[in-house]
């Protein structure tokens, strides 16, 4: 399909009104995911290319008076030199990967079948830990605050539907540990992950949010964005 010329005739490719709504919503932050969904660790990529990509992202944000301070790396690919680029351009925080060998940053070729299989199983059984963090004890990396991932909220799968209770329990149990110890539990997903099986995905999200609400009432758990920790 050809890309349209404005949000009015092509809302799937343009979303300035959505950006403005997010910017006005209390507690929400607009961060960066790079300009071109840049894969830092794939063969042939250079630091100069990454710098140009970040400069483009900053320029676009500036047009809407948005100050970018938090960053999420596409495919969770990054190295220390990429963090240094972000720091020099004013970023203060980024989402880091879970501290397990199966989540270690790598290019596509490094994502072996074994790593993928363990990551999938880890969504249903606690194979790598709860990934609860004390962000202030962890310090910084290359001058940036690392807000480490705890869990990707993977989308509903009809093939794995019998395991859904295990997936939800995996998330809730980690939230329980965070609430009991005053730690950080960082749950994330992409909006398009809910594009299929919307009812099933929203139902899971409601269960997670209801569980959070109980911890908010009983233990004072709060919902924060990445920039809040920088």
Language-model features and meaning:
Residues 1-70, 75-147, 163-187, 194-230:
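Catalytic alpha-helical scaffold of carbohydrate-active enzymes acting on polysaccharides/glycoconjugates
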Residues 147-160:
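C-terminal active-site rim and adjoining tail of enzyme catalytic domains
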């Amino acid at each position: 399909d050809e890309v349209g010329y404005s949000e009015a005739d092509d809302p799937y490719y343009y979303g300035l009104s959505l950006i403005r709504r997010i910017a006005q919503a209390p507690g929400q932050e607009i961060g960066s995911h790079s300009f071109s969904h840049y894969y830092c660790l794939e063969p042939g990529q250079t630091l100069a290319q990454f710098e140009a990509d970040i400069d483009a992202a900053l320029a676009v944000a500036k047009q809407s008076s948005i100050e970018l301070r938090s960053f999420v790396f596409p495919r969770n690919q990054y190295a220390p030199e990429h963090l240094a680029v972000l720091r020099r351009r004013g970023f203060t925080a980024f989402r880091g990967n879970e501290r397990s060998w199966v989540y270690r940053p790598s290019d596509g070729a490094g994502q072996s079948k074994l790593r993928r299989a363990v990551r999938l199983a880890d969504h249903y059984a606690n194979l790598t830990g709860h990934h609860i963090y004390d962000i202030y004890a962890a310090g910084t990396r290359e001058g940036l605050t690392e807000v480490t991932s705890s869990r990707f909220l993977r989308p509903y799968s009809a093939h794995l539907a019998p395991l859904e209770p295990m997936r939800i329990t995996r998330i809730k149990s980690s939230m329980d540990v965070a609430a009991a110890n005053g730690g950080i539990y960082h749950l994330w997903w992409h909006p398009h992950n809910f594009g299929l099986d919307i009812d099933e995905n929203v139902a899971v999200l409601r269960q997670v949010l209801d569980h959070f609400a109980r911890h908010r009432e009983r233990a004072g758990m709060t919902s924060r964005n990445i920039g809040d920790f920088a």
